[in-house]
Amino acid sequence: MKAFSKILCPVDFSPCSRLTAHYARQLAQACASQLIFLHVKPVVTEIYETMVPELAAYVSRNDQSLNEVFNDFAGDWAGKHEKIIAGGLPHEEILRLAEQTQADVIVMGAKGLSRVERYLLGGTTEKVVRRARCAVLTVHDGDPHLPAENILFPTDLSDYAHRTWPLVAELARLFKAKVHVAHIIDLPQLRHQRPRDESMSNFGHKLKVAVREQLQETFASSGVDHEIVVVEKQRGIGPGLTELVDTLHTDLIVMPAHGKNPLAPPFIGGVTERVVRMAHCPVLTVRHHQ
């Protein structure tokens, strides 16, 4: 199994986008993949050009300048790659090109020219993550790098989540990485108990033991270096996972695009959305089709 054969990397020339392009080149080199850089420019309505004739000449000069910036931005990477400039709405063009080129994964920044976009629903990245049929790898500011040494694979114990495992295992073998298979036990009943009920504490302990045993059995013959991590968090699953990222020195998170119910609208206040927004490392979300 080859992790990724074709990688689509949208760029808007922001600092985060430059980091993303570098990460995409590293991934393409590791996977021997074709890399497609995409820049989506705003479209000037034709009727405006007829009203102000000089506008058409300005757009033409701007396109030439854009090509020069794009060539510099893509770097001198010698691998198989392509540069595409399209016009339109960014998320629509990214999704269209992903389908048209049959990309296996879209690698894009957590935020673009707007530094607050990552905290708002409706940003380009979140629209792409919601709607893309292929995997989406979201890169955050900081020091994203490959090869990854520690991969975090969160699971809700469902068969749907475990369909992501073959890709996780392939990436672990590719990077010679260790995988932390993690499950967060979230018992909402514990959050509002004052004082804490000891019987609920016992239930939590028994659940941790049972979940650990189930995961150990499930991944016993995985063939990759892995560790089972089961923790109980009262703050919720999303915050619990982002805490694990720091504790486990995670370089890459790989998780399904939604949880136990694949028919539910993904990323509307869900766990995966919170992780994509707030994690300090790249997050690869994978959607499985029935």
Explain the meaning of each model-derived region.
Residues 1-2, 23, 53-57, 72-106, ...:
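Structural beta-alpha unit
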